[in-house]
Amino acid sequence: MTAIKLIVGLGNPGTEYEQTRHNAGALFVERIAEKQGINLVADRKYFGLTGRFSHQGQDIRLLIPTTYMNRSGQAVAALAGFFRIKPEEILVAHDELDLPPGVAKLKTGGGHGGHNGLRDIIAQLGNQNTFHRLRLGIGHPGVASMVSNFVLGRAPRAEQEKLDASIDFALGVLPDIFAGEWNRAMKNLHSQKA
């Protein structure tokens, strides 16, 4: 399968949104940058924080959009368009209401499932939904009317520790993801639970 050239971490900008459930994807990309020893730098051209590193001679770019979640596609389309990165060479990390905290799953393609960040990325990529997703479980409040406050809220410590563990599990399968070994990455990641 295709190797990844761009990893996007979704979230909302600003200190008031740091450590909220909705910023799980951004946290994942921050952890990659930390592990790689690189700084993410604000780049107005790409509407986000960007970084770059090499893995076994392969150039991999990181992006955390600094637009609000529902405009994430603006950043993804700008960077992917400039560097000629195809949708299937993109991994988007995002919070997932349909998975419990401590669970992370990889998925290729599909709809947006009501996630406004994914919805905008699909639209901005010309209705291309073939990009890969890292779904980081945050759980569900149980009632649809509570979702907005839930995702924009900070998780209790025990829940945050589970999210951190799922991010660690996902970091552990990155070498397989970089190599395009999706089946192996999925098998290893999907067998983990915090």
Swiss-Prot record:
Keywords: Cytoplasm, Hydrolase, RNA-binding, tRNA-binding
Subcellular location: Cytoplasm
Residues annotated for tRNA binding in this entry: Y17, Y68, N70, N116
GO cellular component: cytoplasm
Site, Stabilizes the basic form of H active site to accept a proton: residue positions: D95
Enzyme class: hydrolase
Record's protein name: Peptidyl-tRNA hydrolase
Pfam families registered for this protein in UniProt: Pept_tRNA_hydro (PF01195)
GO biological process: protein quality control for misfolded or incompletely synthesized proteins; rescue of stalled ribosome
Family that this chain belongs to: Belongs to the PTH family.
Active site: H22
Entry-linked InterPro entries: Pept_tRNA_hydro, Pept_tRNA_hydro_CS, Pept_tRNA_hydro_sf
Organism of this sequence: Pseudomonas fluorescens (strain ATCC BAA-477 / NRRL B-23932 / Pf-5)
Keyword Cytoplasm: yes
Primary localization: cytoplasm
Molecular function GO labels: peptidyl-tRNA hydrolase activity; tRNA binding
Site (Discriminates between blocked and unblocked aminoacyl-tRNA): N12
Reported function: Hydrolyzes ribosome-free peptidyl-tRNAs (with 1 or more amino acids incorporated), which drop off the ribosome during protein synthesis, or as a result of ribosome stalling.
Assembly and oligomerization: Monomer.
Catalytic activity: an N-acyl-L-alpha-aminoacyl-tRNA + H2O = an N-acyl-L-amino acid + a tRNA + H(+)
Highest taxon above the source species: Bacteria
UniProt keyword annotation of Cell inner membrane present: no
Gene3D superfamilies: Peptidyl-tRNA hydrolase
